[in-house]
A protein has these predicted regions:
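Short, glycine-/Ser/Thr-/acidic-enriched flexible segments
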Residues: 10-12, 45-50, 59-62, 91-95, ...
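Glycine-rich beta-alpha loop elements in corrinoid/cobalamin-binding modules
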Residues: 1-14, 232-267
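Ferredoxin-type iron-sulfur electron-transfer modules in oxidoreductases and energy-metabolism complexes
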Residues: 32, 65-77, 81, 102
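Contiguous mid-protein beta-loop-alpha structural module that forms a pocket-lining wall or clamp
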Residues: 197, 217-218, 223-230, 241
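Acidic, low-complexity intrinsically disordered segments
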Residues: 1-57, 62-66, 70
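Short glycine-enriched, charge-decorated loop/helix-capping segments at active-site entrances
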Residues: 59-61, 158-163, 234-240
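Conserved SAM/AdoMet-binding glycine-rich loop
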Residues: 76-219
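Extended hydrophobic secondary-structure segments that form protein cores and membrane-embedded regions
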Residues: 4-6, 42, 119-121, 219-225
Length: 267
C-alpha cells in the first residue's frame, strides 16, 4: 500500500511465448493516404540472428523466423492483384533461406512484362549480390540503404556488426556495376568505446568509396546511440548531448568537404 514499493506476490509473472510463424502478415488495406501509398507490405522474417549489441529487435524477437517460401509467393501474387507496389519487410530479410529465390521470382515477373515496383528494408552489406541488385533496379529502385553502423572495423566488432571494409567496398562495386545509382549509409554516433579515430574512419571510408566509384552517389544518415533494455548495452549510458553535437558537427563538416551529403538526427 506504499506508493512506489514493489511487492512481488501481487504481480503476475509474464512468460514470453515464441511461436512459429506460418501465416504471413501483410497490408490489409491499400490507400493513397498511407505513409507508403498503395504499397502492399509483406513481412518476410521476424527477429534477427545477428544480435548486434545495441539492437532491441535482435533480442526481443528471438529466434529468427521466416515465412515459408510457398506462402510468400502466394501473398506476393495476392498483393500484385491489387497494386504494383510491394515492400518486403523484416529486421533481416536477407537471412530468409529463400531470399534470393524471392528476388528471382519477382525479377522473372518483371522480365515477363509485369509492372512491379519493389522496395526492401535496409540490407546487410553481405546481402548485396548481382542478382539482388538486378532485381532492385528492374523494380525501379535507384538507391538502397546499407546499415554499417560504424566507420571502423574495431567499433563494428564491439557491437557485433562483423563487417569488414573490403565487404563494404565490394558491395558498392557490385551495386554500381549492376545498375544502382547510389547508397545511403546508416550509422550511429556515441556508441560505447567510440573514439575520434572511429569518426575519422567514416570520413576515410567515404573518401575511398568516392575515389573508387566515380559517379556513384553516396550519402550518410546518423543517429545517436540510445541504450535499449534487454540488450547487451542496456546499462551503457547515453553520451551527453554536447559531446554528441561536437561529433555531429565534425562529421557534417568533414563529409561536406568531400561533397558527401549527410544528416544527423536524434540528438
Amino acid at each position: 500500500e506504499i506508493d512506489g514499493v514493489y511487492v512481488p506476490k501481487y504481480s503476475k509473472i509474464v512468460n514470453k511465448h515464441t511461436k512459429k510463424i506460418s501465416e504471413c502478415i501483410y497490408t490489409p488495406i491499400l490507400t493513397e493516404d498511407a505513409f507508403f501509398p498503395n504499397t502492399f507490405i509483406i513481412e518476410m522474417t521476424r527477429g534477427c540472428a545477428n544480435r548486434c549489441g545495441f539492437c532491441l529487435a535482435s533480442y526481443l524477437n528471438l529466434p529468427l523466423r521466416s515465412i515459408p517460401y510457398e506462402t510468400l509467393k502466394q501473398v506476393i501474387d495476392l498483393g500484385l492483384e491489387n497494386t504494383n507496389k510491394i515492400a518486403l519487410l523484416g529486421a533481416q530479410i536477407s537471412a530468409h533461406p529463400h531470399f534470393h529465390d524471392i528476388c528471382k521470382y519477382i525479377y522473372e515477373k518483371i522480365q515477363n512484362g509485369q509492372n512491379i515496383e519493389m522496395s526492401v528494408s535496409s540490407l546487410r552489406v553481405d546481402a548485396i549480390t548481382p542478382d539482388v541488385v538486378k532485381t532492385l533496379v528492374a523494380a525501379g529502385q535507384k538507391n538502397s540503404t546499407l546499415a554499417i553502423e560504424a566507420g571502423s572495423e574495431r567499433l563494428r566488432r564491439v557491437i557485433n556488426k562483423n563487417l569488414t571494409e573490403e565487404q563494404i567496398f565490394n558491395a558498392v562495386k557490385i551495386a554500381k556495376d549492376n545498375g544502382l545509382k547510389g547508397f545511403k549509409f546508416y550509422g550511429m554516433i556515441g556508441i560505447p568505446t567510440e573514439t575520434q579515430a572511429d569518426l575519422e574512419a567514416i570520413i576515410e571510408l567515404a573518401k575511398r568509396v568516392k575515389k573508387e566509384n566515380k559517379g556513384f552517389d553516396i550519402s550518410f544518415g546518423f543517429s545517436s546511440f540510445v541504450p535499449k533494455p534487454h540488450t547487451p548495452f542496456q546499462w551503457c549510458g547515453r553520451e551527453d548531448s554536447k559531446s554528441l553535437e561536437k561529433k555531429s558537427n565534425f562529421l557534417l563538416k568533414e563529409l561536406r568537404k568531400i561533397g558527401v551529403t549527410a544528416h544527423v538526427s536524434s540528438i
